[in-house]
Amino acid sequence: MPKKTKEGERINKTLKNKKGITLIALVVTIVVLLILAGVSVSVVADKNGIIQNSQETKEQTRAAMVEKERDLWKLEGQIYQSDSEKETLEKVLERLEKENTITKEEKQAILETGEVTIAGKTIIFIDGTIVACGNEENSADGSFLGNTSIKRGDIEQINIITALNGHDANDEKTWDISERKNGRYLAWYEDKDNNNFWEVTIAGNGRVKLNKSAKLLFKALGTYAGKIEMNGIENLDTSEVTDMSYMFTDGSQYTDLDLSSFDTSNVTTMSGMFYGCSKLTNVNLANFNTKNVVKLSNLFNGCSAIENINLNSFETSNVTNMYGMFGNCENLKNVNLKSFDTSKVTNMEAMFFNCKSLSKIDFSNFNTSSVERLKRMFVNCGLLTELDLSNFKTENLLNVETMFSGCKLLKKIDMRNATFDKVQNYNYMLDTLPSDVTIIVKDDTQKEWLSSKFPERANSIKVQGQT
């Protein structure tokens, strides 16, 4: 548990020990707060000589106090990383209500919308996010962010900006996309070039914060328009996102995506994120933080135009599923997997399925001790001539069906550390390999097992160290 700093202790005292504040100290505090907030104080004295604020100034004072409490609460959140040490928003608001700093209605408004307006000033406690769209109909004919007036396939341009530019949710062709329905984030659409396809703007006062679920967010855009232009993607705040599955899926019109501004530190699933992006030739994932990601299945499946994928920044120590990760990347020539930690991966099925242009894959750092499924892993990898799987330890392996089917140029497979004791499904594992292939195995036991399943390959199977 992190140690509390002196600043943290001061904040706690400020937040929790207010009963001892004297009237004089309170007045001084209020005046200081008002000076800091740029509020001019107008006062009158009654017959008892007690200083009284005008009603307007009282409200301004109250707004300043609430704003100060908000700032202290946020600062405390930055100092203490542990939730158990932070004062929850509910407790802060209960205390402020008890002290008559806010009303019951204002407390409820903050809990529901994340903000409150006092003396004409909006005080934001929680920015909120845009709506989640994973439950929408996300085909090309589906709505976009809840708007049923436009189809995803008819959108030709997305512009993400950091100002509302005077737009209101009640404006024609404008709608509120904030999860709290407080107008924090808006979207509007127009047809500037009169071609019956839409330019959509997503806006907020500041960066647009995505929902925890960004699932299917940009799916199937531009399908009918025949193009999709994405501007201002760096204005998306992805810091709270946990689910990016199928975020750009079926984006057949995407050609270049620079996602280097994405904060992915909380993301747990990226399954199918670029699934079916058949025209994508370049994707920049340089700053991706994948330390919490568990699922990478189908990540690039169907990205048939891409030739190079650089995953140097990927930390995969918590990933369990890599099913179809590069499946159907027919033009993929180079993929860098040197940063991969695969110690927890149980499923590598179809990982390189139909990667017809790959001539070499470096597995030197792969740990396959947890892997159960290697089924279809290299199906139709027609340019591979050699596979060095010498560090594959497979004590938990269950399924190797059609593992090398269609690898018609493969002359050597080194599996000198693999064991097949638990394998239950092995059909067609070696069936389509060339007749002169050499398969290196660990010992006579593994040779006997493979030979018994594939007797026509008996002469091709060699024990390591033996000629």
Q: What do the predicted segments below correspond to?
A:
Residues M1-K19:
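N-terminal leader/signal peptides at the extreme start of proteins
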Residues K19-S42:
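N-terminal single-pass transmembrane signal-anchor helix
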Residues G38-Q52, M403, Y426-D431:
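Small/polar residue-rich beta-strand/coil "junction" motifs that cap repeat-based extracellular fibers
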Residues G49-D83:
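Membrane-proximal N-terminal amphipathic helix
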Residues N53-Q55, T88-E90, T129:
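Non-cytosolic, low-complexity segments of secreted and membrane proteins
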Residues K74-T122, I126:
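Extracellular/periplasmic head regions of type IV pilus-like filament subunits
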Residues I124-G134:
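Low-complexity, S/T/G/P-rich flexible repeat/linker segments used as non-globular hinges
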Residues G134-T467:
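Negatively charged
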